[in-house]
Curated annotation (Swiss-Prot):
<dbReference type="GO" id="GO:0019843">
    <property type="term" value="F:rRNA binding"/>
</dbReference>
<dbReference type="GO" id="GO:1990904">
    <property type="term" value="C:ribonucleoprotein complex"/>
</dbReference>
<feature type="region of interest" description="Disordered">
    <location>
        <begin position="151"/>
        <end position="173"/>
    </location>
</feature>
<dbReference type="InterPro" id="IPR020594">
    <property type="entry name" value="Ribosomal_bL9_bac/chp"/>
</dbReference>
<keyword id="KW-0694">RNA-binding</keyword>
<dbReference type="Pfam" id="PF03948">
    <property type="entry name" value="Ribosomal_L9_C"/>
</dbReference>
<keyword id="KW-0687">Ribonucleoprotein</keyword>
<keyword id="KW-0689">Ribosomal protein</keyword>
<dbReference type="InterPro" id="IPR009027">
    <property type="entry name" value="Ribosomal_bL9/RNase_H1_N"/>
</dbReference>
<dbReference type="InterPro" id="IPR036935">
    <property type="entry name" value="Ribosomal_bL9_N_sf"/>
</dbReference>
<comment type="similarity">
    <text>Belongs to the bacterial ribosomal protein bL9 family.</text>
</comment>
<comment type="function">
    <text>Binds to the 23S rRNA.</text>
</comment>
<dbReference type="GO" id="GO:0003735">
    <property type="term" value="F:structural constituent of ribosome"/>
</dbReference>
<dbReference type="Pfam" id="PF01281">
    <property type="entry name" value="Ribosomal_L9_N"/>
</dbReference>
<protein>
    <recommendedName>
        <fullName>Large ribosomal subunit protein bL9</fullName>
    </recommendedName>
</protein>
<dbReference type="GO" id="GO:0005840">
    <property type="term" value="C:ribosome"/>
</dbReference>
<dbReference type="InterPro" id="IPR020070">
    <property type="entry name" value="Ribosomal_bL9_N"/>
</dbReference>
Amino acid sequence: MKVILRSDVENLGRLGDIVTVKSGYGRNYLLPQGLAMLVTPGNMKVFELEFKKLQERMNDIRSKADELAKRISGLIVTVLMRAGDNDKLYGSVTTSIIGHALAEQGIDIDRRRILLDAPIRTLGQHTVRVRLHADVIAEFIVNVASEEKLYDDTPDRTETEESTKELQEEHAE
């Protein structure tokens, strides 16, 4: 089945490409989603008329992806995880965990766009890539820190009780 792509489709082609796909993929996914249209003489004329509009829309999406990439690149996102000896994590840092950490910083990205070569299973800094558009990939750093070490840095209970008593005495005077 030959179709004309109405938008960029990952692992298939770009806007305006005429590609051959299996019938089921075309009928059940590309055509209902509006990502493609059948190649017929009538559809070719219709596509030529709407090509400029589609091209402008794709350029807008690309420019928004570029702006978001500028915001993301150089960003350091901290993720707290439980870790055992030798800085090994109990479990691993997943794309959904990274997505939630980005959302906390005001950047909303679908977890499926976050690219991990392998699961993150150790503490430290790791470089993570995000595919924002077919042509735009941004990189940022995920700092995986241990929850236990953060709790160990808190002052002892006796120290906090002493400082609380001192503050109460100052206010009583």
